[in-house]
Amino acid sequence: YDHATGMLQKPRVVMDKGVDGVKDPHDDPTIQIDKDGYLWVFVSGRSNSRKGRIYRSINPFDITAFEMVSEFTMAYPQIMYSPERGFFFFFTRYDGTRQLFYQSSTDGRNWTSYKQLASIKNGTETRSGHYQISNICGNKLCTAFNRHLNGNVDTRTSVYVVQSTDWGQTWTTVDGQPVTVPVTKRDANCLVVDYE
């Protein structure tokens, strides 16, 4: 949207997976804008079969053209941005089944190594699985996630919440108790609702 003219540009196709026969909403993108006005598009991959991609607009505040910045294994991208710190990226990898990870970047091009956030298995379970929703409020990152019993997506249960005020260096519960990541225990201190 151009605030000066009051005009809305026509949509722009950044990446069309349909040309490869992909018609899967798992591949939907997430959009972020940085402090300089560049538009960033994080296109989800699917499992380990299709890699995710990051694109950046060639010019600030302009959807005319994009460049691909990187391609790697990731799904369900959730990208946060701080003008002071840069990008913080929550995402899923299928190293096992739907495990949660995060990484950060000051410029969107050079990223820290990804770190695992959660992979909960209980008792005799051999696989984990999670879905999450995340947000940023001021300098606080927060994510809430469930767990899938033995990795079965149809057994979504319980709610866990962790937060960080130092850009993912340390994590705590909502009441400030330290949380060790990756969260691997069913009864971890960040469990807020137990539905099992």
What residue spans do the PLM features occupy?
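Extracellular, repeat-based ectodomains that mediate carbohydrate processing or recognition
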Residues: Y1-E196
